[in-house]
């Protein structure tokens, strides 16, 4: 495992992650890709509220400037 944030994202590729966004929105899905701006591509994504599934989205691109944290 690397020390830098992008190393951690690289280690998390093709695994399930939880992404917290500004405004307290939260998504869970399989991390398929990312870039240097921390834009994320999730597959099998679900929107969560209080740990419960609100809706299933499928594939989604999340803009990096909205990301608060990514939990592998």
Curated annotation (Swiss-Prot):
GO terms for cellular component: ribonucleoprotein complex. It comes from the Archaea. Residues 4-72 form the Sm domain. Pfam families: LSM. CDD domains: archaeal_Sm1. The keyword Lyase does not apply. Keywords: Ribonucleoprotein. GO terms for molecular function: RNA binding. Coiled coil: none annotated. HAMAP family: Lsm_RuxX. Belongs to the snRNP Sm proteins family. This is Putative snRNP Sm-like protein. It comes from Methanococcoides burtonii (strain DSM 6242 / NBRC 107633 / OCM 468 / ACE-M).
């Amino acid at each position: 495992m690397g020390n830098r944030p992008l190393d951690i994202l690289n280690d998390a590729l093709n695994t399930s992650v939880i992404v917290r966004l500004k405004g307290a929105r939260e998504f869970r899905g399989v991390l398929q890709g990312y870039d240097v701006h921390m834009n994320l591509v999730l597959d099998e994504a679900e929107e969560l509220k209080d740990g419960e599934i609100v809706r299933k989205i499928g594939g989604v691109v999340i803009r990096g400037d909205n990301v608060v944290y990514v939990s592998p």
